[in-house]
């Protein structure tokens, strides 16, 4: 810097001694100086260092390190954290105060319930006793009038007190304050946990706003005053309690494996929500509606009975003993009704169901919104709140998924859609679809099963070939014979007259038939007996005719014969090898048993002679319309 100042001084002196012959003053250029500023080791990387700026009056160093600005921002941040912490502490103080208030008011209203119940019952029973005495002592007119008037006044007072008591439902008020005390204690623990966990990171304004919202929601769900803000005790519809603020679900991309969430856990939580919605919540809402209706009936019956007793007691001593009977009976019944309603605390039961239904709604909302809590911790909390272990919770979710997959959701399909499905099914699939569930069975009765043309398949002696080239599919035919190594012989089993087989056949209308087939042991003569179940006595009755249907015994079904060319009505189609016993010549026979003539026919001899087959089967192809 000393050298710089010296150069500047020399420059000024030379300028003053210049000649005046020139018209302009020429200021010489300043020499260039390479000024190197040593690098200072700085730990804080937030400092900003700028190069010196040359000005007319010299060099002006601008080393803006913004240290003071950073300090001011840090101070403002600390002040904001202190402010938010103070606000949250103020909310905590209000929560603690509300815990004590709801606890004290709950005890007070519990005293109301017991005192009012005892007072109303004592007044009612005393008035009933006085009405009975007045009706017995009808000879003394003056004394009867006095006792009757006193009884009327007492019963009228009991009517008013009972109506007031039924209006406010003290037992329900007590349960409201119990729930409010418990929930405010939970909120207090929640705020204290936030204050502990965020002592270093700092409390945000969102934490304060959320705490305030929860306080206001609890105040709305469980109000302290009776006038103006008291909850409706007899609403038209039972609704669960709601004491939590509405939350928005967080985006799916925030779910990470590192936070304990995975696809299996998310699926498990969704199944738990379905169980809560379909089973627990519906059950408690149903029970709540029943308790609400019962409480409404009891609340109306008590004052009505005491009112009738009060009116009847006013007519005691006027020449009729019926007034005394009505007064004493109604007053006694009123005491019983009041004891059942308030001694049994039916209002408390209604509030308990309302709070329980609200709890399941809260669980459903909590799982759906999925606050970004660790997945495993969240699963543990859900299991404990539902009163289950982790293994039981996972088993519940798995069984719920399987039950919905197995048919509970299929049973809710609309009938129009089911009819469209049934129209595209073959006969066999149509019969299978009917057995899925009762709703499908009802829908199948509106849809006629599709009548298909039966096909006949022939099994060649040397194999079964199809459309696939150079492929032969072997089949095996079993024989019940004894062999001597050279030829088959029929075993001598004694005097065997019949061999009877029983088959079940499903008709076009879905009814079940029993078909007994009979064959002689020494011939190929068949006969059949058909039986139908009588639903009135659950016994099989013999059926003589199939009408326009024909039985395909190989498939166990019937087809509509008059709609298919070449199929005879009131007949049974079968292959002879199924019923053969020791008689070989008819293995490849394709037979028809006519129920009208009771004879077996072989209408397809030309097919049997053309194809060297060892067996034949009737079947209905499963060709569906798309």
Swiss-Prot record:
InterPro entries in the cross-refs: Chloroplast_duf, F-box-like_dom_sf, F-box_dom, KIB1-4_b-propeller
Pfam families listed in its UniProt record: Beta-prop_KIB1-4, Chloroplast_duf, F-box
Keywords: Coiled coil
Coiled coil: 171-200
Residue ranges of domain F-box in the record: 407-453
Name the record gives this protein: Probable F-box protein At4g22030
Species the sequence originates in: Arabidopsis thaliana
């Amino acid at each position: 810097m000393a050298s710089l100042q010296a150069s500047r001084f020399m420059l000024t002196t030379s300028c003053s001694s210049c000649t005046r012959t020139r018209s302009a003053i020429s200021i010489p250029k300043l020499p260039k100086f390479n000024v190197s500023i040593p690098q200072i080791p700085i730990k804080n990387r937030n400092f900003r260092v700028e190069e010196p700026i040359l000005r007319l009056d010299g060099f002006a160093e601008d080393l803006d390190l913004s240290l003071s600005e950073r300090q001011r921002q840090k101070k403002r941040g600390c002040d904001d954290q202190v402010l938010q912490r103070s606000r949250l502490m103020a909310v905590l103080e209000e929560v603690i105060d509300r815990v004590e208030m709801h606890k004290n008011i709950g005890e007070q209203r519990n005293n109301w319930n017991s005192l009012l119940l005892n007072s109303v019952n004592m007044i009612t029973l005393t008035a009933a006793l006085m009405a009975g005495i007045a009706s017995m002592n009808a000879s003394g007119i003056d004394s009867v009038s006095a006792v009757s008037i006193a009884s009327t006044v007492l019963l009228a007072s009991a009517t008013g007190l009972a109506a007031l008591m039924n209006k406010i439902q003290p037992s329900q008020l007590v349960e409201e304050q119990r729930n409010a005390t418990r929930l405010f204690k939970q909120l207090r623990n929640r705020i204290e946990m936030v204050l502990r966990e965020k002592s270093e990171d700092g409390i945000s304004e969102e934490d304060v706003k959320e705490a305030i919202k929860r306080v206001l929601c609890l105040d709305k769900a469980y109000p302290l005053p009776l006038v103006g803000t008291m909850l409706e005790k007899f609403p038209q519809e039972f609704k669960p309690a709601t004491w939590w603020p509405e939350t928005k679900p967080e985006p799916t991309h925030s779910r990470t494996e590192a936070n304990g969430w995975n696809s299996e856990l998310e699926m498990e939580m969704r199944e738990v929500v379905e169980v809560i919605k379909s089973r627990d919540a519906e059950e408690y809402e149903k029970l709540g509606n029943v308790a609400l209706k019962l409480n409404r009936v009891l609340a109306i019956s008590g004052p009505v009975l005491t009112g009738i007793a009060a009116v009847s007691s006013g007519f005691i001593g006027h020449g009729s003993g019926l007034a005394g009977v009505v007064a004493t009976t109604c007053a006694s019944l009123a005491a019983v009704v009041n004891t059942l309603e308030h001694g049994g605390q039916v209002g408390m039961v209604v509030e308990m169901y309302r709070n329980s239904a609200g709890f399941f709604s809260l669980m459903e909302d909590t799982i759906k919104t999925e606050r970004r809590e660790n997945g495993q911790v969240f699963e543990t909390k859900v299991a404990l709140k539902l009163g289950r272990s982790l293994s039981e919770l996972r088993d519940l979710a798995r069984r719920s998924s399987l039950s919905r997959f197995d048919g509970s959701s299929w049973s809710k399909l609309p009938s129009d859609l089911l009819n469209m499905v049934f129209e595209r099914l073959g006969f066999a699939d149509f019969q299978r679809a009917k057995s899925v569930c009762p709703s499908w069975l009802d829908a199948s009765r509106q849809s006629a099963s599709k009548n298909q043309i039966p096909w006949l398949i022939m099994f060649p002696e040397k194999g079964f070939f199809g459309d696939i080239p150079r492929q032969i599919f072997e089949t095996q035919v079993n024989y019940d014979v004894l062999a001597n190594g050279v030829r088959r012989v029929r075993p001598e089993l004694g005097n065997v007259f019949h061999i009877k087989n029983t088959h079940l056949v499903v008709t076009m209308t879905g009814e079940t038939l029993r078909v007994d087939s009979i064959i002689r042991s020494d011939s190929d003569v068949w006969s059949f007996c058909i039986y139908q179940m009588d639903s009135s006595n659950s016994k099989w009755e013999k059926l003589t005719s199939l009408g326009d249907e024909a039985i395909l015994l190989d498939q166990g079904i019937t087809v509509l014969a008059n709609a298919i060319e070449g199929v005879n009505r009131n007949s049974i189609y079968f292959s002879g090898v199924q019923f053969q016993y020791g008689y070989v010549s008819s293995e490849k026979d394709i037979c028809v048993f006519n129920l009208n003539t009771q004879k077996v026919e072989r209408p397809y001899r030309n097919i049997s002679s053309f194809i060297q087959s060892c067996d034949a089967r009737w079947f209905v192809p499963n060709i569906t319309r798309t």
